[in-house]
């Protein structure tokens, strides 16, 4: 059986990744794709338990390296238990965050060594990278304003970080975009949701058609 495709959605907090993913799935399924959606951290019970620890607002003393290693542990279990089996079954796997989040948040955001993070990503994934990454770019202030307005969104520990941290995170994403422009495609997330979905679908379909 032909291996499936792995797509990751990345971007700063408030960029709307989850809303875009929710809108894309029925469209892609109507096109005949078997779609598996999942998220990081989380996706499987062990990884979801780690997610609770990472995002708990009460864990204010968490060290940056501790945070990174928890993400890496969650990533490994999620990959082995859910992502790889779906890819082997020929499915289209779309992940809400993956390896680029660690570079952005723990590398640029927390100031940890990016080379160390890239090595840990490689170790945890056995070198697996997404076939395509959609990076939803948004001004940091606008993203945080969206979070504040969204009463249905549970505020987590990372949401409580200051503006400068979130600005560094965005710079981390722009670093990854420049480093790997063939894999990462920038989407303007400041547009209306329907336009963001339209742009995302166009990029996805172009990639899917090139692989068919």
UniProtKB/Swiss-Prot annotation:
Domain of life assignment: Bacteria
Record keyword Transferase present: yes
Short name of any one Pfam family annotated for the protein: Thymidylate_kin
An individual GO BP term: dTTP biosynthetic process
Listed PANTHER family: THYMIDYLATE KINASE, UMP-CMP KINASE 2, MITOCHONDRIAL
Homology family: Belongs to the thymidylate kinase family.
Function text: Phosphorylation of dTMP to form dTDP in both de novo and salvage pathways of dTTP synthesis.
Name this protein carries in UniProt: Thymidylate kinase
